[in-house]
Amino acid sequence: MTTNVQSIKQMIEKVGHLSPFELKDELIHLAQKAENKVGRPMLNAGRGNPNWTAATPRQAFFTFGQFAVEETQRVWCEKDLAGMPEQAGIYERFKRYSEVYAEAPGMTLLKEIIEYGIQKHGFNEDEWVYELTDAIIGDNYPVPDRMLVQTEQVVKDYIVKEMGGNLLTSTHDLYAVEGGTAAMCYIFDSLMANRILKQGDKIALFVPIFTPYVEIAGLPNYDFEIVKVYASEVNEDGRHTWQYPKEELDKLADPSIKLACIVNPSNPASVAINDESMDYLKAVVEEKNPYLMIVTDDVYGTFCDDFKSLMMTMPYHTLGVYSYSKYFGVTGWRLGVIALAQENVFNDLVKQLPEDEKKILRKRYKALTVTPDQIPFIDRIVADSRQVALNHTAGLSTPQQVQMAFFSIFALLDQEETYKNQTKEICRRRKELIYAQLPSLAEKQDRYTTSYYNQIDLLVWARLQYGNEFVRYLLDHYHPLEFLFELAARYGIVLLNGSGFEGPTWSIRVSLANLKDEDYTEIGQAIGELFEDYATKWKAQGTTLSTIESEGKIESFMW
């Protein structure tokens, strides 16, 4: 297929400013045209949701749902109408049900889930089964609004374990929310509503980062001054390690920076902050900026070996966000939590507000309690999520909370971590398939790399393969987005631009989670072929194009 280079350049000029998630639609349009012309299916590796789902906890959920419906009909059954479940004796009724329907899908796990709460936490048998039964029926508002009592405890077990914490010392409270994206919205709104973050304040973003963090910060109602903390470390070969050098972390010593936002492991680099940087970051904040607020988004933590979250290593400073979407394949379920230690900087900053601002907040929350000053920040997030006045209807839907609990206990019961190792192996295998086609770029797997995405910096590749003259040629003759547009137009392959995540301008993101294994071989082949096509055109010119005097100067083009 012949690519109209001029039309691609015109298209980039028109849409190049868009978010990568909107730019993706333009790339899909090009890829679909290629699909029609060459008869090859489009490959969209721009999407982040995986192509696997956790089956057994879903089976347990739907089997338990049938039990719950029978419980409502036991109370009252009149044609299509039923009653509400009753607590007394419900555990024994469940045991009888599980014996009668012993072969029902997911029943073995379901019985283990029920027994987990009883054996691990000492839950009252009837109270535990009733909470789950009433919740899966969804006939009541969530009470408490932040999270169902026993459900919160089992979900906390999962969160603390996967985030590298200690259940014996963790004091985290959880707020169940509609996925990580809802958590982001709620958190920023509450920081502003409670006046511990104000319009125009200085915040730090650890980049590359999930694009909406950048876009939210620039919205007119926030208009934050952004300080970027770059994962700019490179190894001896000049390759990105996607770690944060000390000089970048030192930026947080500035006490005028009120908030730091981090995605860890990162998106799109998919690398967790290493232990050395975690320790250094903690020292900088505690010594130089003791009232810094941190929001860490750790959705990819389960794909990393021995992951440690800032919500566990720096609990006083850190508000944690976790989404179940990627690990369990539940982007459509909208399952996430906000986690905050009971002693935290957010509470203390609210207490330190001047009296005139405290009066405003007392008025805001006075309908909720006679002691509005004492409302913890996490409960303020809950109220703010429903404009305070609708606080009594706040909270994640109760059936969603049940599915969240089932996923959590399923993972906790998997002592051999069979499911976790499966998901890790899928991503790592697909990464190897890509690099089998790009041998000069092959990377070593280390324990900080998740391989959920892969970020390739085309300029680093160009320098490693052909030297600085080829880098200069690319800079002089191509727009950074041109590679992606040609990849879509010629091969029907959709990837995202790393620059849209505040990554290196010439970097591209490949999602390793959402296509079939064999598709990644094809993607690797296409990337390599297009790259070599650029190199062939450069070689054909037969002249030295480099205007760069030393390798050091080329570094300015790398980000």
Please state what every model-predicted region is.
Residues 51, 58, 311-377:
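Active-site PLP attachment segment
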Residues 344, 351-356, 360-417:
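Long, C-terminal catalytic modules of enzymes
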Residues 399-410, 417-435, 443-471, 501:
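Conserved glycine-rich beta-strand-loop-beta hairpin in the small C-terminal domain of fold type I
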Residues 48-53, 181-183, 209-211, 265-268, ...:
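Short, solvent-exposed loop/turn segments at secondary-structure junctions
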Residues 84-290, 301-315, 319, 478, ...:
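Conserved core of the PLP fold type I
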Residues 13-18, 55-61, 140-143, 233-243, ...:
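Short, flexible/disordered intra-domain loops and linkers
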Residues 2, 11-21, 64-136, 140-169, ...:
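PLP-dependent enzyme catalytic core of the Aspartate aminotransferase-like
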Residues 1-78:
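N-terminal glycine-rich, Lys/His-bearing helix-loop that initiates the first secondary-structure elements
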